[in-house]
A protein has these predicted regions:
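Conserved NAD(P)H cofactor-binding loop of Rossmann-fold oxidoreductase domains
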Residues: 67-72
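Residue(s) in the substrate-gating loop at a strand-loop-helix junction
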Residues: 118
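Active-site helix of classical SDR
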Residues: 98, 134
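Substrate-binding pocket helix/loop in short-chain dehydrogenase/reductase
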Residues: 74-75, 82-84
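Alpha-helical segment proximal to the catalytic Tyr-Lys
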Residues: 103, 147-148
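Active-site loop-to-helix junction immediately N-terminal to the catalytic Tyr of the SDR YXXXK motif
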Residues: 78, 124-132, 144
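N-terminal Rossmann NAD(P)H-binding glycine-rich loop of SDR-like oxidoreductase domains
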Residues: 10, 14, 18-19
Length: 151
């Protein structure tokens, strides 16, 4: 049974993953609100990854980072704070999570890290400037981590 740490498992993609994986895996969920699902294989920690201290985890085989936010506005209505918030949630939160749990992850069974991007990084979709910029940074982070951490 794999031990999977999901950040952002209370809604959206994170919740769908949690629901799909919880039957056959031990899931540790970190999110600001608890998921609606309750299961013997699920442990939840209420935590804001950006502002709170992350909980101690003894064992983990995979990290899945998927807190959700999307700021769909025309560039004329986006504020610099919107860009900062999207970057903080998508990049800084992922880096904080990875740095915190990497020593434990390296001891895991076939360790893996999963981060999410958006098709807007390659298609250039309208109203996606802020999230596309943040997710492009996530893609760069993934490439760098792959080169650094691959066996």
């Amino acid at each position: 049974m794999r031990k999977i740490l999901i950040v952002g498992g209370s809604r959206g993609i994170g919740n769908a993953l949690l629901s799909k994986l919880v039957e056959e895996n031990k899931i540790i969920n970190i999110s600001r609100i608890p998921p609606s699902l309750s299961h013997v294989n699920l442990t939840h920690h209420t935590c804001d990854v950006l502002t709170d201290e992350l909980p101690t985890v003894e064992e983990v085989d995979s990290i899945v980072y998927c807190p959700g936010s999307i700021n769909l506005k025309p560039i004329s209505r986006l504020k610099l704070e919107d860009f900062r918030n999207d970057f903080e949630i998508n990049v800084i939160g992922a880096v904080k999570t990875i740095q915190q749990y990497l020593p434990v992850l390296k001891r895991g069974n076939k360790p893996s890290i999963v981060l999410f991007s958006t098709v807007a990084t390659t298609l250039g979709m309208p109203f996606h400037a802020s999230v596309s910029a943040a997710k492009s940074a996530v893609e760069g982070l993934v490439k760098s981590l792959g080169a650094e951490l691959a066996p």
